[in-house]
Amino acid sequence: MSRDDDDDAVYETLSVYERSFSAISERFFKKSAWPKAEAIAGLADNDAMFKMMYSELYYRHIHAATTPSAEERKGAWDNYCALFGALSTGEANMQLPTLWLFEMIDEFVYQYQSFQQFKGGAKRTPEEVSALKALDAKVWDQAGVVGVLQTLVDKSGIKAILERERKGEISFSETEGYDLSSSNVLTVLGYYAQIGISRVHVLKGDFEGALKALDAIDLDKAGLFTKIAGANVSTRYHAGFAYFMLGRYTDAIRHLNESVQNIERIKFGAIRPHALPLLLKKQEQMYALLAMILSLVPGQNYLLDESVSLTLHQKYSDKINRMTSGESALFDELFSYASPKFVGGDNAEAFKAQQSAFSQVVASHATVPKLRNCLKMYASIQVDKLAALMDVSVDSVKASLTAFNSAYTLKEWNGGASALDGDDTYCGDVKVTIEGDLVRVDEEKRVKSVKEVLARANANLKMGLEDLASARPLVIKASSIM
């Protein structure tokens, strides 16, 4: 880490962090722990900050290479509390790569999730149960985790900084939080802590809380989270999943479409090789979410980029057809695959609670695909004839028509300050009006506006130019040293 204002020192730190640590781990500590901080602290004059930073990597490696014990999980928690507590004072006189700072927050939340999965698992040994009981109840407790992250948000003043950026007064995201006149550490940690809080809420099933935590971040513009592949994917996956569970399907599509495109664009060289499998798995999960959305509310393909739509068709056309034909078991299968690992008490019960809520949504949309296919054949049709076509009673088809309009009336974000903002919008390509015993059908051809197409093309061009730029940027990107 750099304790001066030398730009080169930050790049050297990034090189050690990205390359050297993983290379040494692979060669000498593939299935074992690194030496403890106390064993090597003398090499850094027993510097307290060095020991905490080193220990963060030490415990991170233990979680990646071994199965950590309850005591090691506690050690990681204690070290994070000490490290973030020290950094929250704002007195750190060093610059750190933004990649490392994001991954500190990301790993902190991962270890919380890992601990909760360990604690709520059904296959613990008697020794593990005993070790867990011996731990303080606050170790990796949700309130404690959110409290640590919220302290970073509050102490960093990041919300005020992002508000000034929205007004055009500063360019925090453009400089990636890197400032030669002061340390970037607390400010950038505060930024990514918001994303961490959002992720914790998703894991607990609080989807409105997850989106609320992102209020200060403009998710529909390039920002600090879009500069790092892992941050971009994590943010959009969890935001997309939150929208998905809230039934805001067009908003979910917007984020999932963007993220799978981004992974496709960067996977052949712009990210570290060892990070690629995780991103590809997340991409597959997002395709599964998109498949479920298009099965629940058919006709939304126009919102997808052409390449995403084609890949989705290749991967899921058969399952989409089967889901729209009423195979609810496929929804369960894809939901199990695409959802995050929920936490809270018993792991299995936490998942079942979310799956049950989603199953109710699937049931309420059961008649939508078949009814849509029937309606698209007519400009108007008698209710009794429609009932005969669907082989149901007149009362049932009337209820289905009401449910049809409700299913396609979604709350949709239209540029508000909060990710929770939105207006009720009809997103279907078929709209029905019931006039006595007559059903009138208006079919709307939905396409992206010229403005949307041009904006997307401009964004793709800008990202491509960034990747091709030969000059080394002032600030750190995940691809800077690849």
Predicted regions and their residues:
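Extended alpha-helical scaffold regions
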Residues: 1-482
